[in-house]
Amino acid sequence: MKASELRNKTVEELNNELIELRRAQFSLRMQLATQQLNKVDQVGKVRRDIARVRSVLAEKAKAANASQA
């Protein structure tokens, strides 16, 4: 998912997306540990998606704090 797509979402939608990505990451890690994962690159993709979502959440929080001050 692109950061530009994430910036159009609300904070609540981003938090839900983050929860889903963390669940997917956990599932992929378990599959990797039990050697059931065929596409190992999925682990890195999910990790980068989590980083994107967290970055956009931080941007929104910073913007909200700046507008309040």
UniProtKB/Swiss-Prot annotation:
GO terms for biological process: translation. Coiled coil: none annotated. One of its GO terms (cellular component) is cytosolic large ribosomal subunit. One of its GO terms (molecular function) is structural constituent of ribosome. Keywords: Ribonucleoprotein, Ribosomal protein. SUPFAM superfamilies: Ribosomal protein L29 (L29p). It holds the Pfam family Ribosomal_L29. InterPro entries: Ribosomal_protein_uL29, Ribosomal_uL29, Ribosomal_uL29_sf. Transmembrane segments: none annotated. It comes from the Bacteria. Belongs to the universal ribosomal protein uL29 family. PANTHER family: 60S RIBOSOMAL PROTEIN L35/50S RIBOSOMAL PROTEIN L29, LARGE RIBOSOMAL SUBUNIT PROTEIN UL29C. This is Large ribosomal subunit protein uL29. The lineage of its organism: Bacteria, Pseudomonadati, Pseudomonadota, Betaproteobacteria, Nitrosomonadales. The gene is rpmC.
